[in-house]
Amino acid sequence: MAANSEDAASVETQIIFDAGVVILIDCTQPLPRILFGRRRPDNVFLPDKWVFPGGRFDADDLAVSACDALEPKDHAALMYAMPAAWTSAHATALALTAVREVFEETGLVIGVPGLMGAPVPEAWCPFAALGYRPAISSFRLVARAITPPGRTRRYDTRFFLADARVITFDCGQDDGEFTEKGWFTFDACRALDLPYITRLILEDAVQAFESPQRTAKNGVPFYYQDGMAYRRDLIAPKARGPYP
């Protein structure tokens, strides 16, 4: 039984969960600031580390509609190297995942006043109860990363960049995922205790913020393990490829 349990645990760590994250930048101060949260020390994955708000895709994210749509180039980049069973709707759902997770972890609403279509799926009931519909048109895909094998959890995470002006309401409550939250200048972000991949993507986000034309031309960075190497490929606009 012990061996079987260990085998089951090993298989669990190899499951790759899809996830959505949003990097919010506040441009109202002399120096731009990014929102970070510090994960609880008892978390299995990245305990006590500072991270961007976001989290795991939920099937309920497919059952809601945004009040707007992603830019075509961002939607196309999201479709790159998708699992075979995924559709265009799944790409949009990843942005909705980021909206929902930001709300759960920080209490911040990214949306517009309005009623969500009934029935509202369970994961979205708290958001809908405030009288808002999710908004995603301002999201820009700036990176994608798959957690390497051997970690306690593995995620295929899409990182979106957005101006903090997309925040329309702060409900003042969160799910306790973070022990503290804060807005930090770029240099202050670099001084935080960040996971290695977060540090890499922070630089990608800063570059996308400062030189959006360069990112649009070169493509979206995609980090993943390839044998013994950890690769950084660029997802060119409208590119498609096999799932790693």
What do these predicted ranges mean?
Residues 1-244:
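N-terminal leader/linker segments that precede catalytic domains of diphosphate-processing enzymes
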